Amino acid sequence: MSHPSTAPAHPSRLALYARLVRIDKPIGTLLLLWPTLWAMWMAAGGPPGWTLFWIFFAGTFLMRSAGCAMNDWADRDFDKHVKRTKERPLTAGLIASWEALAVAAVLALIALALILPLNALTKWLAVVAAVLAGTYPFFKRFFAIPQAYLGIAFGFGIPMAFAAIQDQVPFVAWLMLLANVFWAIAYDTAYAMVDRDDDLLLGMKTSAITFGRFDVAAIMICYAVFLGLMAWAGSLLGLGWPYYAGLVAAAGMAGYHYTLIRERDRMKCFAAFRHNNWLGACVFAGTFVAYLLK
């Protein structure tokens, strides 16, 4: 006796929206969160207080999620030609373009609402951060190294943290933001190496394409500059040996990444990108212990 075939269940709208904002892929949120946490501890001279911590934690998650939705909307005509992205909900036709924009707008508005109790400087910087997040996807069309712009967008929690805690953005905050730009170029170039062949066919601009055969060397130079600038920031703040131990551990992580990317294998390059979460964690651990013992 034959049984009637059962049609595969379609994912719910909520599940599709969760995929749109990469709920299942938290690496982007973590790469946004670590620099923000470094800055919060440095600005406060230790733990910043739970209220501020949760405001920035939630804001980071929401803005990264909004950025993912905005990115998919901006790249909807390109992603269908890239193996890694062609199954995304918007590209696959499972949700409409207006839905992606609506999700991005709602999440961004919630994130902006979170900072209403904070001072005016932080609010103005939040507006700048929102503009950076919303415009980044379009820089890949014409800017040779869009990863530098990404580094500014992903690191803007640094000046915001100093503004929220100190009501000013001192030199050390901008120094750390510059350091974050080099870190972002390093990890996102490894990420761009995964899609380089597809991006070349589509005429997209990425640092992996711009650096060409010097891509691995460029990544390692960016790691070195990042660590050097962070060491400078630590000296300006008078941080002790645990902070520098964290930077040494981060340097060890960068060395490990070299072993992954040197052959330019796609899967290993992607692994190096994901592993930057632990590099960021090393810097935070050093910062945390340095203030704990100060």
Curated annotation (Swiss-Prot):
Compartments annotated for it: namely: Cell inner membrane
User: One Pfam family of this protein, by short name?
Assistant: UbiA
Q: Which cofactor does it need?
A: Mg(2+)
**Where does this protein act, in terms of pathway?**
Cofactor biosynthesis; ubiquinone biosynthesis
> Which major enzyme category is it?
transferase
Q: How does it sit in the membrane?
A: Multi-pass membrane protein
In alphabetical order, the GO MF annotations are: 4-hydroxybenzoate polyprenyltransferase activity
This chain's function reads: Catalyzes the prenylation of para-hydroxybenzoate (PHB) with an all-trans polyprenyl group. Mediates the second step in the final reaction sequence of ubiquinone-8 (UQ-8) biosynthesis, which is the condensation of the polyisoprenoid side chain with PHB, generating the first membrane-bound Q intermediate 3-octaprenyl-4-hydroxybenzoate.
Transmembrane segments annotated in the record for this chain:
37-57, 101-121, 142-162, 169-189, 219-239, 241-261, 271-293
Q: What gene name is given for the protein in this entry?
A: ubiA
- What is catalysed by this protein? all-trans-octaprenyl diphosphate + 4-hydroxybenzoate = 4-hydroxy-3-(all-trans-octaprenyl)benzoate + diphosphate
Q: Which Gene3D superfamilies match?
A: UbiA prenyltransferase (1.20.120.1780)
Q: Which PANTHER family match?
A: 4-HYDROXYBENZOATE POLYPRENYLTRANSFERASE, MITOCHONDRIAL, PRENYLTRANSFERASES
Instruction: Using the UniProt record, give the first listed, main subcellular location.
Output: membrane
Keywords annotated in UniProt: Cell inner membrane, Cell membrane, Magnesium, Membrane, Transferase, Transmembrane, Transmembrane helix, Ubiquinone biosynthesis
Record's GO cellular component terms = plasma membrane
Species the sequence originates in: Cupriavidus metallidurans (strain ATCC 43123 / DSM 2839 / NBRC 102507 / CH34) (Ralstonia metallidurans)
EC number(s) stated in the UniProt entry for this protein? 2.5.1.39
In the UniProt record, the signal sequence range is none
What name does this protein carry? 4-hydroxybenzoate octaprenyltransferase
- Gene Ontology BP term (one): ubiquinone biosynthetic process
Task: Say which family it is in.
Answer: Belongs to the UbiA prenyltransferase family.
